[in-house]
UniProtKB/Swiss-Prot annotation:
Organism superkingdom: Eukaryota
Pathway stated in the Swiss-Prot or TrEMBL entry: Phospholipid metabolism; phosphatidylglycerol biosynthesis; phosphatidylglycerol from CDP-diacylglycerol: step 1/2
Stretches with biased composition (Low complexity): 44-65
One GO CC term on file: mitochondrion
Annotated positions binding ATP: A160, S161, L162, Y163, L164, G165, T166, S167
CDD domains noted in UniProt: PLDc_PGS1_euk_1, PLDc_PGS1_euk_2
SUPFAM superfamilies: Phospholipase D/nuclease
PANTHER family: CDP-DIACYLGLYCEROL--GLYCEROL-3-PHOSPHATE 3-PHOSPHATIDYLTRANSFERASE, MITOCHONDRIAL, CDP-DIACYLGLYCEROL--SERINE O-PHOSPHATIDYLTRANSFERASE
Protein name per UniProt: Probable CDP-diacylglycerol--glycerol-3-phosphate 3-phosphatidyltransferase
Length: 581
């Protein structure tokens, strides 16, 4: 009993992650202070809910003996994942019914068509006008779109981010929100941040909560500032881990920015470096209420589970009356979160591009542009390990495993430390694969102080070991790695692209907050979209975005690593704690 009670404290992965942030977390290192939280209720931390990925109320999928993800390839990190619906066990009745449209394909390409049905078995599908989709390239353009979105909004502004910075650009963004509230009496604002990161005090004695405090005080009836608190930080851990270190247990990591019916989805936070010289990815989906409403609902549900900023004491978080405390009622909190969020995962639900409601249709053939040969679909995915919601992990695993041999596959990951599942799927695949990650100089921790200064070298060792495994598995001619290197810039872009045979440009991209690592899978709240299209203009935009990221890169090979000197201490840290990075 004693060993079990002490296990969370001495768990080496948590200990190392905590030590890593002592002394700085990269270019935006700050000082810390303890956050005061008012909470009510009693309870204790329990194991996560063992319910399957989708609730019993969701439509079920006919079981096939052969899974699209071979059990020899798919690493199951938790027993509960065994209860999740395996991709490949979908019912083809949706594509082989007796209706007049049943013999038609969604996409002309066989792989795209099969992938469509696989993904629709795991959650809703949204038809989108491809002319309404654009990819942003520069951080400054990301910031300008945020400012412009705030200025244009008439009914809602919904933002989810890890945190809001405290520099001039962030203050200007909040100022524009105040002006927008003055101009539009019907406008409502909801901002969801991580409660631990959002109340951390910086060198300027400010935090996300204090920067937003005046906006909340002026318009408390129309402004909501939600602060998510992970239920995994409880008990002794809650008492002994100081601010900054406690963030390693789990955070709200979704990055979505909604302005009326426009959605800007990214991996970028609301911070100066993400507005200036930290390269990320950003997709803008305009005038598409169905997709915007879906992501707005994600934020609303998480917000309903979160603590809230006290307008009278801006760095203090309050628990709403009747709410479940994530700290003292951890198990109840997880069960409630699962129940609420799993309602989003409605399989075989199709939303037409011209729909002004949240109503879906029964068949994708009832949508508008299904017969023009250039249809475009978006599949949102969420990953919330603390609540046992693993939709993104399941579909990403399937994509890694199912990419056709004659396709071109591209992955970007700034912190390249794939889960063992993803790594095995990549190494046993056959398509040509190009990977881009950050060089040590482009790592966000480069130049920081304390143990965190070792982070770039830790990732360099992991990258070298990956290259060695590529060689050892005879994948040297198939898999290549590039490193992003740009003077005074850091790299934070995440996602992938797939270019199928007989296509000149990518037809598929994944973009959002997940990073393909164990932290994204197990600890944080994540969301992204899978975009599939045969529209030539949109494919060209996807190609341009991909090529832009590859512009400032250098080839990474084993010879390069022979020139990099890594201390024995760093090697020891990776040897002991590498699976957690």
């Amino acid at each position: 009993m004693i060993k079990r009670a002490l296990a969370p404290i001495v768990q080496p992965q948590r200990l190392f992650a905590a030590l890593m942030v002592i002394g700085g977390g990269g270019r935006s290192a700050t000082t810390t202070t303890t956050t005061t939280t008012k909470a009510c209720g009693n309870g204790s931390s329990q194991s996560p809910p063992s319910t399957p990925l989708l609730s019993s109320k969701s439509s079920t999928i006919t079981s096939n003996k052969k899974s699209a993800i071979p059990s020899s390839h798919l690493y199951i990190p938790k027993k509960s994942t065994l209860d999740s619906r395996q991709i490949g066990n979908y019912s083809r009745e949706y594509s082989t019914s007796s209706s007049s449209s049943s013999k038609k394909s969604i996409f002309n390409d066989t792989y795209l068509n099969d992938l469509f049905w696989q993904l629709s078995s795991q959650g809703p599908a949204f038809e989108v006008n491809p002319n309404n989709i654009d990819f942003i390239q520069e951080p400054i353009d990301f910031y300008n779109h945020l400012i412009d979105g705030v200025k244009r909004s008439k009914k809602r502004i919904t933002m989810a981010s890890l945190y809001l910075g405290t520099s001039k650009q962030e203050i200007e963004l909040v100022k524009e929100m105040k002006l927008a509230m003055e101009r539009n009496k019907e406008l409502k604002i909801h901002i969801l941040l991580d409660g631990l990161r959002g109340t951390r005090i910086g060198l300027d004695k400010e935090s996300s909560a204090t920067i937003l405090g005046e906006l909340l005080s002026l318009y408390s009836d129309r402004v909501t500032i939600s602060m998510y608190h992970t239920p995994d930080l409880n008990g002794i851990l809650k008492k002994v881990l100081p601010p900054r270190i406690n963030e390693t247990i789990g955070v709200q990591h979704i990055k979505t920015y909604i302005f009326d019916d426009d959605l800007l989805l990214s991996g970028a936070n609301l911070s100066k470096d993400y507005f200036t010289n930290r390269q990320d990815r950003y997709v803008l989906i305009r005038s598409t209420s169905t997709v915007s409403n879906y992501f707005n609902e994600i934020v609303e549900i998480i917000g309903s589970l979160s603590l809230h900023v006290d307008k009278d004491n801006r760095n203090q978080l309050l628990l709403s009356s009747g709410s479940i405390d994530p700290v003292t009622q951890s198990n109840e909190f997880k069960n409630l979160a699962y129940t609420k969020l799993s309602t989003l995962l409605k399989s075989h639900s199709y939303y037409p591009s011209n729909s002004n409601s949240n109503s879906s249709v029964d068949s994708p053939f009832d949508c508008n542009n299904i017969n023009n040969g250039e249809t475009t679909w978006i599949f949102p995915t969420i990953q919330m390990g603390p609540f046992n919601i693993r939709q993104d992990e399941v579909v990403t695993s399937h994509i890694f495993e199912s990419v056709p041999n004659d396709s071109k596959f591209f992955i970007t990951s700034p912190y390249f430390n794939l889960t063992e599942n993803y790594l095995n799927l990549i190494l046993t695949g056959k398509p040509k694969l190009d990977i881009i990650t950050c060089s040590p100089q482009a790592n966000g921790f480069y130049g920081s102080k304390g143990l965190s200064s070792a982070v770039p070298d830790c990732y360099a060792i992991i990258e070298k070991r990956f290259l060695q495994r590529v060689q050892d598995t005879d994948n040297g001619d198939r898999i290549s790695v590039q490193e992003y290197i740009r003077d005074k810039w850091t790299y934070h872009a995440k996602g992938l692209w797939i270019q199928v045979k007989n296509q000149q440009h990518p037809s598929i991209t994944l973009i959002g907050s997940p990073n393909f690592g164990s932290r994204s899978v197990e600890k944080d709240l994540e969301a992204q979209i899978i975009l599939i299209t045969q529209n030539k203009q949109l494919q060209q935009k996807m190609e341009n975005e991909k090529n832009y990221l590859w512009t400032d890169t250098q080839n990474a090979n084993l010879e390069l690593f022979e020139k990099r000197k890594v201390s024995l201490m760093v090697r020891f840290l990776v040897y002991i704690f590498g699976n957690y990075l």
